[in-house]
Amino acid sequence: MKGEWGMASYPIYQFYSELCNYEPKIWRRFQVPGNITMAQLGYIIMTMYEMQASHLFDFSVPSRDNFILYLKALNPNQEETNLTTFKNKEIIQYKFQNDDIDILWEPITNKMKSAFFSCSGEKLTMKYDNGDGWEIGLTLENIIMDKELPGRELPRVLGGAGYGIIEDCGGPGGLKQLADVFQKKTGLEYEDCCKWLGRQELDLLSFDSNDMNFRLKKIPRIYRDIYEYGVQPTQRSINLLERKYLKR
């Protein structure tokens, strides 16, 4: 991220995010510099939720609802009926490419500020892997100016709970099934899941903020190279992705 070469001279965006359609909640609260692209925001989210950059992703921004929220923040006394006459398109999608002429979209490599994040409460959704149907709901909590904060500290996670996703497990329903199987730790289904994942333990309640902040300074760059330049990870990067550093 460019912001690491100096102080955080750009606004800092603080988001609350949550894996949709899954209980117990898997969530993250995090901060990013305001000069990143929507794609970079995606790489940060993918890192935090254990997504392995093996599927396409996009963002949906409810621009009409967010703009109404912004107008309310500017003028809390403005009548609701006047706000709802706003005629902008309801949803803007940020994607790498688009084959559907009926949707309003922008390149996902556009700067994040193009999504018109202006006040607390604005929302967006990240979708990953259309087959499994993972969705991460995000809410902008705050826009901060902290010129004393070294840019190298961003992005950073402030808090969270839960492990994240397991690739190609069938979405939230499959993740819940995996959680149940590994909790029982017995039977043929458990043995099959162990072989498939290559592990005998799976704690979907675990979250290590220190480890995640370490990964957030490194992995988003690897994902950027994969999606934007078609560069496959080196063995060193693969070792990082697989947390081989924890086994030393």
Predicted regions and their residues:
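Short linear regulatory motifs enriched in tryptophan with gly/pro/ser
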Residues: 1-248
